[in-house]
Amino acid sequence: MNRQNIDALIQKMNVDTATGPVDARTQQIVVRLLGDLFQAIEDLDLSQTEIWKGLEYFTDAGQANELGLLAAGLGLEHYLDLRADEADAKAGISGGTPRTIEGPLYVAGAPETVGFTRMDDGSEEGKIPTLIIDGTVKDTEGNLIEGAKVEIWHANSLGNYSFFDKSQSDFNLRRSVITTADGQYTALTTMPVGYGCPPQGTTQFVLDKLGRHGNRPSHVHYFVTAPGFRKLTTQFNIEGDQYLWDDFAFATRDGLVATAVDVTDEAEIERRGLTGAFSTFNLTLNWLLIKMVRRQLTLIVVALALNYSEVQRFQLAFCTEISWV
């Protein structure tokens, strides 16, 4: 069956049969995706057995709550980031730290404080080094931003996330912290480690078929928002991890890598309220936020009219220094 016949068949089955109100966008997407799927079936000569096995696979992946993991592992999330980067470039928006994937393990509703937060529940205290994250939220002109919300989440020493790992307390290693009047925040937490896909899971099943591993480097996730600005989704990854530039989710990007140095100065140890030497990351990340979606058309018009010079007024940079113990 050629594409013309495929399109006619889809029109007959999914457009002409409508008897009630139609959501035009949903119809457009379904018709296009079905057309491409049917064409792939023709091009690859997929058998009915292969098609039904595929449907069974997606059923299993959904029941295992791994569809989000699969999206990351096959590069869908990274593609969406690159597409967003391209859109920003076309609009003349540049600077700041790169965005990168959210991943499938965010949970809304983490405890929220102002200025300082402790992220861990103490269950791994003394078993894993402590991490102190000091951050500052600014605009691109260096103005401090009060009231920015910084959401942070990461894995424990076993590479597991609370809620998905039922052995952890709710919201362990998940917190939201609001910046103070001077744009500052501090998070006291534990050193994250990387993780691998469940070895018997549906995502690893596909990766095995592709000859790929399913490992991620150690990393910390962020959402950064401020009133009137678009949310930024990003993360930093840890230098020295064997999977740093071989992340199965393709999340590592230039500008998002933290390098640790040892700190043995007793005064600094005391200032941090610690009892022994630790490591620190001399790292500054500029997280760029853009005006909310509802204002994007206005921003683009302004950019075109003013040669992008005024667009910088609508940008927000987020700077953070990360200290490890």
Positions of predicted regions on the chain:
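Beta-strand-dominated extracellular/periplasmic modules and repeats
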Residues: 2-300, 322
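Cationic, low-complexity basic patches in intrinsically disordered or flexible, solvent-exposed regions
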Residues: 313-316
